[in-house]
């Protein structure tokens, strides 16, 4: 059996990426003879983490069909996206012809390139959905209406996997319910050398938010809360851990402008996130809506 997986990003910070990593690890353990391949935007720690379990990979830059709120989306922009989608789907088709997979799986809903390429070649395709974009990503607009995107996902998929019963009930309203299944995920923390997860609490009250620096992940709201706490004369330490996708400079400026350098520490990303769980008294969920809040579950473990 040959399987190919498409990741929307190259870092390993998000819950969707770590679910994909767990899936690859589990498949290779249960079926060591299966060949697993990945397509992702470029090099990064996701590829490093997945390398022991895959037999090959391809870098391919693909545009999301979600764009910033400040972008106008008219007929010209839609036609431009369709042209680029066609171009890179054809490129991906060439790679699929070379590796000859039995099944393709797209991780998250942000682009349809693998699904289209699989359709062109008659390869079965599964969509692994970790979000409900019309309520999760309020900072983004779809290039096409969400009802069209959901219909495309339905038409281009033999199977649709979601991460919770809530997501299953939600998508059954807009897709073929027989195709949709929710899966139970085991959350496991790696052993980390030098970290005492049962250590005594620290002298400073410490909070942690893990997530990519994006406008919908809550970093700015947390910084505003920290500012108010400090203004009331209370001591607090806040860790913000995650890769930058464009929002980190705004957070850094806010920290400097409000004199919070002694209260906020930014960590661009670490593979040893357990270390920061052990440092925190409270871990915050990084968005107002989660289909499966993996970070919160990890922290509770």
Segments and roles (model prediction):
Residues 87-88, 124, 133-156:
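Nucleotide-sugar donor phosphate/pyrophosphate-binding loop at the beta->alpha transition
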Residues 269, 288:
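Aromatic "clamp/platform" in nucleotide-sugar-dependent glycosyltransferases that forms part
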Residues 38-45, 187, 210, 237-250:
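Glycosyltransferase donor-sugar binding loop
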Residues 37-77:
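Conserved nucleotide-sugar phosphate-binding/catalytic loop shared by glycosyltransferases and other
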Residues 46, 85, 89, 103-123:
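An aromatic- and histidine-rich active-site surface loop
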